From Swiss-Prot:
Region feature (Involved in Mg(2+) ion dislocation from EF-Tu): 76-79
Record keywords, A-Z: Cytoplasm, Elongation factor, Protein biosynthesis
UniProt subcellular location: Cytoplasm
Record carries keyword Metal-binding: no
Species in which this protein is naturally found: Rhodococcus erythropolis (strain PR4 / NBRC 100887)
Keyword Phosphoprotein: no
Biological classification of the source: Bacteria, Bacillati, Actinomycetota, Actinomycetes, Mycobacteriales
Protein name (database record): Elongation factor Ts
Length: 275
């Protein structure tokens, strides 16, 4: 008896882009363990693993002010570019910038015109005729850099990056904003490789090894091949190890070092994408 369901097969197909039989076989080989099945399909060369999971399903905008960034969602792009919706987002982020909420619940509890933001959202939702939802908030101290990106000229920003850094002067501010643009474009997840969880590195190393073996690489060449592929993974997900989008001859770290900037932390919001 199969230890997986048709829903598991459907989900695996949507996530990996693999064929039905490949997904069934992967689930069977993994004894129904979904994560192991995904890993097996990656090793076998399945394309776009994880990328489909990032597809956005909601509309809305990202807005930032004075070290605070929020994402507020709606159902359609028609509402996303509605003046009242944009005004509401601006009013909420202004309150958030003053209150510096630690999390989403704290943001919703702040007051705007004598009402909690949660209540204001509900009232505006009824007025506009679509479900509105505050989905994320980030609040940083110290010097910050912000970059907001529009997917379309007629829509408000749908991608936002907030970076907290140390450094002084215009050169430092410019370098930090460049790093924010970098995160918006290439979706780094960590500042340095030391921040990457050990289990993720181990998984990537395992995938690199199994893929190399499946490709028939000579045994004596495996250590170098594995190390190269793991380093490639780090360049994909670690901000300071990426080649700069503004100067491909330099790493982001080199540009930041030249400006005397150290990135403390960052967050990237994309409308509709999971946190």
């Amino acid at each position: 008896m199969a230890n997986y369901t048709a829903a598991d097969v459907k989900r695996l197909r949507e996530l990996t882009g693999s064929g039905m039989m490949a997904c069934k076989n992967a689930l069977a080989d993994a004894d129904g363990d979904f994560d192991k099945a995904v890993e097996q399909l990656r090793i076998k060369g399945a394309k776009d693993v994880g990328k489909r999971a990032e597809r956005t399903t909601a509309e809305g905008l990202v807005v930032a002010k004075d070290g605070v960034m929020i994402e507020i969602n709606c159902e359609t792009d028609f509402v996303a570019k509605n003046d009242e919706f944009i005004k509401l987002a601006d009013e909420i982020v202004t309150v958030a910038a003053a209150g510096k909420p630690a999390d989403l619940d704290a943001l919703k509890a702040l007051e705007l015109d004598g009402k909690t933001i949660d209540t204001v959202i509900a009232e505006q939702s009824a007025k506009i005729g679509e479900k509105l939802e505050l989905s994320r908030v980030a609040s940083f101290d110290g010097p910050v850099a912000v970059y907001l990106h529009k997917r379309s000229s007629d829509l408000p920003p749908a991608v936002g990056v907030l970076i907290e850094y140390t450094g002084e002067g215009d050169a430092a501010a410019e370098a930090a904003r460049g790093a924010a643009m970098q995160v918006a474009a290439l979706k780094a997840k960590y500042v340095t490789r030391d921040e990457v969880p050990a289990e993720i590195v181990a998984s990537e190393r395992h995938i690199a090894e199994e893929t190399a073996r499946a490709e028939g690489k000579p045994e004596q060449a495996l250590p170098k091949i594995i190390e190269g592929r793991v380093n490639g993974f780090f360049k994909d997900v670690v901000l300071t190890e990426q080649s700069s989008v503004t100067d491909s001859k330099k790493t982001v770290k080199a540009i930041l070092d030249e400006a005397g900037v150290t990135i403390k932390r960052f967050v990237r919001f994309e409308v509709g994408a999971s946190a």
